[in-house]
From Swiss-Prot:
EC code(s) of this entry: 3.5.4.19
Protein name stated in the entry: Phosphoribosyl-AMP cyclohydrolase
Subunit composition and interactions: Homodimer.
Keywords: Amino-acid biosynthesis, Cytoplasm, Histidine biosynthesis, Hydrolase, Magnesium, Metal-binding, Zinc
Cofactor(s) essential for the protein: Mg(2+); Zn(2+)
A GO MF label: magnesium ion binding
Lineage: Bacteria, Bacillati, Bacillota, Bacilli, Bacillales
Family note: Belongs to the PRA-CH family.
GO biological process assignments: L-histidine biosynthetic process
Source organism of the structure: Bacillus cytotoxicus (strain DSM 22905 / CIP 110041 / 391-98 / NVH 391-98)
NCBIfam families: PRK00051.1
Enzymatic reactions: 1-(5-phospho-beta-D-ribosyl)-5'-AMP + H2O = 1-(5-phospho-beta-D-ribosyl)-5-[(5-phospho-beta-D-ribosylamino)methylideneamino]imidazole-4-carboxamide
Recorded metabolic or biological pathway in which this protein acts: Amino-acid biosynthesis; L-histidine biosynthesis; L-histidine from 5-phospho-alpha-D-ribose 1-diphosphate: step 3/9
Gene3D superfamilies: Phosphoribosyl-AMP cyclohydrolase (3.10.20.810)
Protein's cellular compartments: Cytoplasm
Amino acid sequence: MRPNFSKGLLPAIVINEETKEVLMLAYMNEEAYEKTLKTKKTWFYSRSRQTLWNKGATSGHVQHVKSLYLDCDQDAIVITVNQVGVACHTGEKTCFHHKII
């Protein structure tokens, strides 16, 4: 089974394999997906810069891919990772650190 990239980008939810914490949400195009499969490190597509980026390439906070899951409609991906360092560019452990309720 493969993701359906017919509409372009797919949301990719990244989860810490050990703690099950949601670390971040990013977007993948087909090229980012293929690079992720090949390298076993996360690659995403930046909507603002319109280019691929490898998580941790600059900061060293890489994500080693442990598994990928595809949803029932083949239009969303969950990636479990071994996170090195923090996930959020703000320096927080996770991008989801603002509790609402």
